[in-house]
Design a protein with these regions (language model features):
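Short, charged beta-turn/beta-strand-edge "cap" motif at the junction between a beta-strand
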Residues: 16-20
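Compact nucleic-acid interaction/catalytic patches
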Residues: 22-30, 35-69
């Protein structure tokens, strides 16, 4: 049975192994990501990768996600400047669902980042 995903779900995804599958500052390895949009019939999802490493610099494209509100093991940061489309084949598991407040924060930052 094929899996379906929805906006705001936190999933684990294999984003590639450096250096062969990752270039420059792209996020890689298996990591949690937030589903922004799922195209279930195409088995594709637009995701924002998460990291637990606090940035050494301030970017308006980074949204802090508290572990208590997201079912994560550590406070994390949504890297909205790293948005990408992935195949469902890259998704290894579902983790949790973001609360509406965090989904709206990410949505707002994506509007600014993508100049929509």
């Amino acid at each position: 049975m094929k899996q379906n995903y929805s906006k705001g779900e936190i999933i684990n995804a294999n984003l590639g192994i450096p250096p062969k599958e990752i270039k420059g500052h792209e996020q890689g390895m298996e990591r949690p990501c937030v589903v922004i949009k799922s195209f279930n019939n195409l088995e594709l999802a637009i995701v924002v990768p998460l990291t637990s490493k606090e940035a050494k610099y301030s970017l308006f494209t980074i949204v802090k996600i508290l572990k208590a509100t997201a079912g994560l093991t550590a406070d994390s940061y949504a890297l909205c400047h790293q948005i990408r489309t992935i195949s469902f084949d890259r998704i290894t598991s579902k983790r949790a669902k973001l609360d509406n407040k965090d989904i709206l924060k990410i949505h707002s930052v994506l509007i600014d980042t993508l100049e929509l």
